C-alpha cells in the first residue's frame, strides 16, 4: 500500500472530549470518525484491525465446533415481550414502529431471535448440541455514551448461543467456549483474567467475564494473591471475618445520641468498633409500574454493593428494575430519620428489609432507634422473626479469599467478553422445546457467549499504547512495516524504497510505503501515531553503507539491518512479540 493512496485522515490534536488514550489515538490517527453520540464510522485503518480480530475469532470459534450465521439486527418487539425483557431492559432498548404500526427493537442481544430459530428447526435430541454464532452490529441506547468505543451506543459484537438436551451438555459447552475465548484473547496478545460475574439483564444461573487489565478500566475485579479466585466486585465474596475483641457488652436499652448519625461517630460515642454498629442504607426501588423503598442493613465498617442488593430483592420476589438513592423527601414520606434508622418497627415504614448475611449471628449490636437523636444498644438480631439475609456487602481489599484465606486485591479492568449459562429461562418463555430419547417434550438448556469486537480495539490500545500513539499487538497492527524515506526528492532513496517495498511484499509482509513528499519528522510522527509494527528508515547512510535503521513501535528500540539480510531480519522481528 502506498501512503499517498491510503485514506487515513490524521488530526493535529485529539478531540477535546476524548478522555481515554484509546479514544484520543483512534480519532487522531484517522481510525474512527464520530457520527453522533456513541456512534462511529470505522475508516480503513480501523477496518483492517477489525478484520484481523474477526478472522482470529472465526478461526477459534469454528475450531471449537461453532457455526457462523448472520441474524437480523431488527427483531419483533413481541418476542422481547414474550421473554419478559421488553420492560426489564429499560430505556437502553431502542423500540420503534414501522409504517404499519408494528413494534420492533434494534437488538442489543439476540437471545429471543435465536431461541425462535431453534424452536422452529430443532425438533429432536439427535440435532443437539448445536452452537451458532455471528459477528454483527448491535445497538444499546446508553444513557451516557463515553470513552470512544469503550461505551458506544452502536458496536460490533460476536455473540453465540448453544442449545442442549441437558445441563451436563451445557456445562461442557460452557467450558469449551471458555477455552475458545482464552485462545482468542491470547492470539490478540492481551493480558486478561477470567472472573466470576453477575448475569445482569441477560439472566441465567452462572456467568464469567473476560476482562483486560488496564488502569483506565470501567470495572473493578477482586483477585486473590494466593489462588486463582477472581470475581467482579459486583458479586465478589469473602471469608467470614473474625470478630473484634472490643465487644460492647450491654443490656438492651435506648440511649440519647445527639447529632451522631454516621457509623463511625456512633462507634466513637460508645467507645467501640464500627463493626458492631448496624448501618442502614435506604434505596428507592424502581418497579415496572411503581416505586417503593428498601432498607439494607450492613455492619458499620462495610459498604453496600448495589448489584448484590438488587439481586437480593429479586430473589424475594420484588421484581425490581433499578435501585436509586432515596431522597430526603422519600425518607420524610416514609417517616424515616436519616442516621437513626433501625430494625424495630421498621416494617411498617419500608416494604423490603434485607440484612447482610454476616449479621446472622449478630448480637451486642448498636442500631438506630427510629427516633431522632437516639440509638439502641445490646440489640440481638436473633430475637427478631423472619429476617431476610443475603450477601449484600462490597468486598474490601482488607478482606480475605473465600477459598484459601489469601489477601484480596483490587484491579481495574475492562470487560471484553462474557459467557452465560442461561438454563431453560428463554426456552420456557418462548416455548422452545424438542423431543428427548423417550419421545418426551423437553425445553432446551441454553448458553450465551459474547465478545465485544469493536471494544477490543480500545482494549488493546488501553493496555499496550503509549502517550505518542497506537501500539498494536503482533496479530492486530494495520501494517507490519512502514518504509520511511528521509528525503523523497532524492531519486536514489526513492528508487531503493520501491525496491525494498517489492522485496517485502514478495515475502508476504504487509508493507506500507510512505511515498508522501513531506517532512521526515512528520512521517515519523505518523508512524508513532498510527502504530505500524516496524518502521524501516531509508536515508543517505542506507545508500552509503547498505544498512537500514529499523524501529520497533512497541518500545521504539532501534536496530541496524544489513541489506543482504533484510528480509530474514524483518520476518524474524515480526515473528517475535
UniProtKB/Swiss-Prot annotation:
Its main location: cytoplasm. The keyword Acetylation does not apply. It is found in: Cytoplasm. It catalyses: tRNA(Pro) + L-proline + ATP = L-prolyl-tRNA(Pro) + AMP + diphosphate. Its EC number is 6.1.1.15. One of its GO terms (biological process) is prolyl-tRNA aminoacylation. It is an enzyme of class 6 (ligase). GO terms for molecular function: aminoacyl-tRNA deacylase activity; ATP binding; proline-tRNA ligase activity. Keywords: Aminoacyl-tRNA synthetase, ATP-binding, Cytoplasm, Ligase, Nucleotide-binding, Protein biosynthesis. Signal peptide: none annotated. InterPro entries: aa-tRNA-synt_IIb, aa-tRNA-synth_II, aa-tRNA-synth_II/BPL/LPL, Anticodon-bd, Anticodon-bd_dom_sf, Pro-tRNA-ligase_IIa, Pro-tRNA-synth_IIa_bac-type, Pro-tRNA-Synthase_IIa_type1. GO terms for cellular component: cytosol. The keyword Transmembrane helix does not apply. Consists of three domains: the N-terminal catalytic domain, the editing domain and the C-terminal anticodon-binding domain. Homodimer. Belongs to the class-II aminoacyl-tRNA synthetase family. ProS type 1 subfamily. Catalyzes the attachment of proline to tRNA(Pro) in a two-step reaction: proline is first activated by ATP to form Pro-AMP and then transferred to the acceptor end of tRNA(Pro). As ProRS can inadvertently accommodate and process non-cognate amino acids such as alanine and cysteine, to avoid such errors it has two additional distinct editing activities against alanine. One activity is designated as 'pretransfer' editing and involves the tRNA(Pro)-independent hydrolysis of activated Ala-AMP. This is Proline--tRNA ligase. It comes from Helicobacter pylori (strain HPAG1). The gene is proS.
Amino acid at each position: 500500500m502506498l501512503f499517498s493512496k491510503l485514506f487515513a485522515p490524521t488530526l493535529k490534536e485529539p478531540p477535546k472530549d476524548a478522555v481515554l488514550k484509546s479514544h484520543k489515538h483512534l480519532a487522531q490517527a484517522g481510525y474512527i470518525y464520530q457520527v453522533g453520540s456513541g456512534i462511529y464510522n470505522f475508516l480503513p485503518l480501523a477496518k483492517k484491525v477489525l478484520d484481523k480480530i474477526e478472522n482470529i475469532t472465526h478461526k477459534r470459534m469454528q475450531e471449537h465446533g461453532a457455526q457462523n450465521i448472520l441474524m437480523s439486527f431488527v427483531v419483533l418487539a413481541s418476542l422481547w415481550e414474550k421473554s419478559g425483557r421488553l420492560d426489564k431492559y429499560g430505556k437502553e432498548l431502542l423500540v420503534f414502529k414501522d409504517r404499519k404500526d408494528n413494534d420492533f427493537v434494534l437488538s442489543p442481544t439476540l437471545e429471543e431471535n435465536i431461541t425462535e430459530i431453534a424452536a422452529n428447526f430443532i425438533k429432536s435430541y439427535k440435532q443437539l448440541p448445536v452452537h451458532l454464532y455471528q459477528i454483527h452490529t448491535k445497538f444499546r441506547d446508553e444513557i451516557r455514551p463515553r470513552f470512544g468505543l469503550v461505551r458506544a451506543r452502536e458496536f460490533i459484537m460476536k455473540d453465540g448461543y448453544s442449545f442442549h438436551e441437558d445441563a451436563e451438555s451445557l456445562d461442557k459447552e460452557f467450558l469449551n467456549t471458555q477455552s475458545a475465548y482464552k485462545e482468542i484473547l491470547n492470539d490478540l496478545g492481551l493480558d486478561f483474567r477470567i472472573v466470576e460475574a453477575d448475569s445482569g439483564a441477560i439472566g441465567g444461573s452462572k456467568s464469567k467475564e473476560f476482562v483486560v487489565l488496564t488502569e483506565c478500566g470501567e470495572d473493578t475485579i477482586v483477585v486473590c494473591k494466593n489462588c486463582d479466585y477472581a470475581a467482579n466486585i459486583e458479586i465478589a465474596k469473602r471469608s467470614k471475618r473474625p470478630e473484634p475483641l472490643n465487644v460492647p457488652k450491654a443490656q438492651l436499652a435506648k440511649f440519647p445520641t445527639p447529632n451522631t448519625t454516621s457509623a463511625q461517630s456512633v462507634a466513637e460515642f460508645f467507645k467501640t468498633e464500627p463493626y458492631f454498629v448496624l448501618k442502614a442504607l435506604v434505596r428507592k426501588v424502581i418497579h415496572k409500574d411503581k416505586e417503593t423503598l428498601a432498607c439494607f442493613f450492613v455492619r458499620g465498617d462495610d459498604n453496600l454493593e448495589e448489584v448484590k442488593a438488587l439481586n437480593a430483592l429479586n430473589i424475594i420476589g420484588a421484581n425490581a428494575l433499578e435501585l436509586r438513592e432515596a431522597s430526603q423527601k422519600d425518607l420524610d414520606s416514609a417517616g424515616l430519620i436519616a442516621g437513626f434508622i433501625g430494625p424495630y418497627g421498621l416494617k411498617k415504614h419500608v416494604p423490603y428489609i434485607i440484612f447482610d448475611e454476616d449479621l446472622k449471628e449478630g448480637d451486642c449490636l448498636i442500631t438506630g432507634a427510629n427516633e431522632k437523636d437516639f440509638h439502641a444498644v445490646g440489640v440481638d438480631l436473633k430475637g427478631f422473626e423472619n429476617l431476610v439475609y443475603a450477601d449484600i456487602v462490597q468486598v474490601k481489599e482488607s478482606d480475605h479469599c473465600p477459598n484459601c484465606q489469601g489477601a484480596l486485591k483490587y484491579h481495574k479492568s475492562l470487560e471484553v467478553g462474557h459467557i452465560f449459562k442461561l438454563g431453560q429461562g428463554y426456552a420456557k418463555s418462548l416455548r422452545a422445546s424438542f423431543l428427548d430419547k423417550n419421545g418426551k417434550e423437553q425445553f432446551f438448556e441454553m448458553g450465551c457467549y459474547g465478545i465485544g469486537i469493536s471494544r477490543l480495539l480500545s482494549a488493546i490500545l488501553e493496555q499496550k499504547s503509549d502517550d505518542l500513539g497506537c501500539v498494536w499487538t503482533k496479530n492486530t497492527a494495520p501494517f507490519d512495516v512502514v518504509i520511511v524515506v528521509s528525503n523523497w526528492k532524492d531519486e536514489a532513496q526513492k528508487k531503493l524504497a520501491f525496491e525494498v517495498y517489492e522485496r517485502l511484499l514478495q515475502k508476504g509482509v504487509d508493507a506500507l510505503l510512505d511515498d508522501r513528499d513531506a517532512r521526515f519528522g512528520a512521517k515519523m510522527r505518523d508512524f508513532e501515531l498510527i502504530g505500524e509494527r516496524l518502521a524501516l528508515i531509508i536515508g543517505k547512510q542506507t545508500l552509503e553503507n547498505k544498512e537500514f535503521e529499523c524501529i520497533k513501535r512497541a518500545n521504539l528500540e532501534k536496530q541496524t539491518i544489513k541489506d543482504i539480510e533484510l528480509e530474514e531480519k524483518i520476518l524474524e522481528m515480526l515473528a517475535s512479540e
